Amino acid sequence: MKSPRQFELLINVGAAIAGIGVIGYIAYAALHKDVDQPCSTRYPAATRFSLHNSEGKPLSAIALQARAGLRDLGVIDNASVVRSAGGPAEDVLEVKLRQLPAGADQDAAAHNGIEFRWSPPGMKPATAACLSYSVLLPDKFAFGSGGFLPGVFGGTAGLSRDSAAGLSVSPEWERDGRPLIASTSAGRIGRISGNKSAWPTGRWVRIEQEVVLNEPGKEYGQTSLWVDGVLTLDSRSVLLRKDAGETLSGVLVAAGYHGTPPEASSLRISPFEISWR
């Protein structure tokens, strides 16, 4: 038979173990609370890429190309601003996923869809950014050999998203439609996957992507992807830069297939928004 002192000791030990468990849970929740929430809830007010001119009318292809800056691929041929009944915005960007015509660009044979860069005033230098937009992949969308969606860029911008001189982090889809995050930095290419579900098709899907640059010499850069508010992919050990002078500059507006498109198709993207710090 245990003495009262032994019972008291057992109770105290049990209480201590329970207390440690509670403290551990609180610490875990505190560490994971931020990353579980979409990044738009934790960043300053976002800057939007407008699809309208000064008169409030949808941009023409020529005006869109002018807003795209000095370098673009496929904007005139494959991009247009269209009305979207029931979508997340009144007007959205429609991208035809077709090969660029011969002569459209010296790299036309290797590209489809569109690509350009947008740098909001005041963004550079930034070491963290949150990009958000919605995308509509048609019902029975052919994922082909994989493809890519708009992401974040920085560093020294090259002429294409595959440039060895640049830094980019973008959502992509695999052959089977599963999402992944692809990063390119100084010629290094990394991919983060693991989600078992394919990108939803036939409806609008909300995307939020967070990129946090690592301190030079340390591999703890962060890339996270939320799909319809659910954290889908997350990594906190990504080497995104080696030089403190490499910072985030804006949105890499790129959408298309890797390789030749499997069939004539298109997708739609709502006006994208980015915030930074």
Predicted regions and their residues:
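N-terminal Lys/Arg-rich, disordered targeting/topogenic segments
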Residues: M1-F7
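Low-complexity, Ser/Thr/Pro/Gly-rich disordered linker/stalk regions
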Residues: E8-R277
